[in-house]
Design a protein with these regions (language model features):
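Short hydrophobic "strand-cap" motifs at the C-terminus of beta-strands
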Residues: 10-12, 124, 149, 180-183, ...
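A short helix/loop element that forms part of the nucleotide-sugar donor recognition site in Leloir-type
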Residues: 163-164, 189-205
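Carbohydrate-associated surface elements
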Residues: 43, 152, 183
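Extended catalytic core of nucleotide-activated donor transferases of GT-like folds
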Residues: 9, 54-145, 151-154
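N-terminal subdomain of nucleotide-sugar transferases
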Residues: 1-57, 91
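Nucleotide-sugar-dependent glycosyltransferase donor-binding/catalytic pocket residues
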Residues: 16, 217-221, 235-239
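Conserved donor-binding/catalytic core segment of Leloir-type glycosyltransferases
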Residues: 9, 205-222, 228-231
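Charged active-site motifs of nucleotide-sugar-dependent glycosyltransferases
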Residues: 4-7, 120, 205-212, 242-243
Length: 243
């Protein structure tokens, strides 16, 4: 059997509960039969900063992949150039995969010429706001491959990486931009029976034809006020007797 490729993952610590962390864990656990993983696990004021944690045995038990290899280096924030050089020298990854807003990675793009001499840079990205963010184009060109989480992102990245307006701009090939939507582990996320005492507590003993559930952080950028306003307008349309 040929030796598995090792991927260096730069993202939120996969043991955390953020969206980035949750999908990082799903991505890693779903590909352990294909790749070995080393993660720089980001968090704010990480309590385990600087301690390399070997999760391989636990991952082997959870996934059934006998040769699963997963290590995490917890860190404050997403790292820096000096840290990356040290890891590349010690771990010798075959590729770097980073994940989250591109503006967190300007230090990475500043050294892309140095990195890409030895391994490619991969980016799992989402950007859903139009018009196309031309200011992101150089970030995208710093990557050898981009996986777009949404169709909107795929369109944006495809258009920007195909531009040739400037002499220094080199368009990406078709294979360098792919649509890779989020998936879920159906063994963990599945319909289930809700205990009647829990349902009664949540709904105050009332019965409804259907119930909306919104799970998110209560912060401004998640726009909870928009959700409340949309729900109010919905209730106004169906009438008080049904709301």
């Amino acid at each position: 059997m040929s030796k598995k490729k090792k991927i260096l993952l730069l993202s939120d610590d996969m043991r955390m509960s953020s969206g980035i962390a949750t999908m990082s864990k799903a991505l890693v656990m779903g590909t352990l039969n294909e790749y070995d993983w080393f993660q720089v696990g980001a968090a704010i004021k990480h309590p385990d900063k600087g301690k390399v944690l070997d999760l391989s045995v636990d991952m082997q038990k959870r996934t059934g992949v006998e040769d699963a290899s997963v290590k995490i280096l917890p860190w404050n924030g997403y790292g820096n150039a000096d840290l990356l050089r040290q890891i590349m020298n010690s771990e010798k990854p075959d590729a770097i995969l980073h994940f989250t807003d591109p503006h967190y990675w300007t230090w990475l793009y500043d050294m892309e010429h140095e990195i890409r001499e030895s391994c490619p840079i991969l980016y799992y990205t989402i950007w859903d706001d139009l018009p196309d963010p031309l200011y992101n184009r150089n970030y995208y060109e710093s990557c050898d491959w981009l996986g777009a989480i949404s169709r909107q992102t795929y369109g944006i990245v495809s258009r920007l990486t195909s531009l040739t307006d400037k002499p220094t701009w080199k368009p990406h090939s078709d294979w360098q931009v792919a649509y890779v939507p989020h998936g879920i582990n159906e063994n963990e996320f599945k319909p289930t029976e809700v205990p009647s005492d829990f349902r009664n507590k949540i709904l105050a003993g009332k019965e409804y034809d259907f119930v909306f559930f919104w799970s998110n952080r209560n912060i401004r950028r998640k726009q909870p006020s928009d959700v409340i306003m949309a729900f109010k307008e919905f209730c106004d349309k169906i009438g008080k007797d049904k709301a």
